Amino acid sequence: MHDRDLLAGRHVVFLSWRDTRNPEGGGAERYLEAMAHGLVARGCRVTVFSAAFAGAPLTETDDGIRFVRRGSKTTVYAQGVWSLLRRRFGRVDLVVDVQNGMPFLSRLVTRKPVVVLVHHVHREQWPVVYPGPLGKVGWWIERWLAPRVYRGCQYVAVSHATRGDLRALGVTGPRIAVVHDGTDPVVPTSATKSATPMLCTVGRLVPHKQVEHAIDAVVALRDEFPTLRLHVVGSGWWEAALHEHAKASDAGDSVVFEGHVDEVRKHEVFESAWVMVLPSLKEGWGLVVAEAGRHRTPTVAYRSAGGPRESVADGRSGVLVEDQQELTWVLGQLLRDPAWREALADGAFDLSRLYTWGHAQRSFAHVIAAAIRGELTDSEDPEEDGDPGRSPT
């Protein structure tokens, strides 16, 4: 039976700590909902369970996906497994357990197939976000408990780096498929490249994104480039700390905090920026890399962050650096050398066109269909059965 025939009428439940409407939602949630839409297009019933937040309905259906929200960002895990145990989702054919550091441990309460979706392993984030015993417990759950609970389950990683990290945790066997992110269509804007030096950083404002490194780079380069501006796009609970850091660094008007913006403004910033800075401690993939690339904006990121080793083609679509000192040096070189910037811009645009949501949805659907059949796979961006040779759209 072809994948599409098998999936039609199946009920897939995603357990996630948040959705895209949540103020703290980001690239991981966009990926989840893109995959959910792909399953809906194949005839699946899809429920996304996530934490409640102010102003959001507890239950709603949007574009074919049923959203159910219960609990807070800490109690959502217990609420999710309780709802699954009490069969409040109705008949379920498969569960996608989204492990953003903390898993739902859904395998303990259901005999249905469970697919574990992982963007990246949080070894570095736990002590940063939760210093002390709480962070140690969280890392123990992710490092030791989860691999044992999900022994024999199918995994989906968004990059080879994440697959490697999972194997290092003991997730063994040919059961970690890689399904890369796609890229959203470009939102038309009237913006053009800034006439004066402009950098941007885009994402949630949380400690492990290390936006301070971008601010420090701008302050260090300001004497040579007095009109240089860094546009910080995004919001989050670390935003006030970043404002304080900019103030303490005497960044002045060199740093522009855009806050949470709509899609049009985000794409205006991508279009205007000369270079995007991605100073994250860890990234599963780096969805914003391809978004910036669609606007011919190359990225500078840390090699040690994991996912950017794949989303950034070092020396062709951007530059991977080793530390904060090299980050500042490379940014300075790019600002001085328009020919180098232009070459990287060409590469960033070309690379961004290789990854599409249509292809990712087909690959994810294949993994889900295989799991329903009781099969495991470690393939990379597979095509659906019965759909050979289709080009990404």
Question: What is the predicted function of each stretch?
Answer:
Residues P133-Y155:
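Membrane-proximal helix-turn-helix segments that form the acceptor-binding/catalytic region
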Residues V156, T189-V218, H231:
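Conserved donor-binding/catalytic core segment of Leloir-type glycosyltransferases
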Residues H243-V261:
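Nucleotide-activated donor-binding/catalytic signature segment of Leloir-type glycosyltransferases, i.e.
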Residues L281:
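Aromatic "clamp/platform" in nucleotide-sugar-dependent glycosyltransferases that forms part
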Residues V289, P298-Y302:
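Short hydrophobic beta-strand element within catalytic cores of glycosyltransferases
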Residues R303, A313-Q325, Q333-A339:
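Conserved acidic donor-binding segment of nucleotide-sugar-dependent glycosyltransferases
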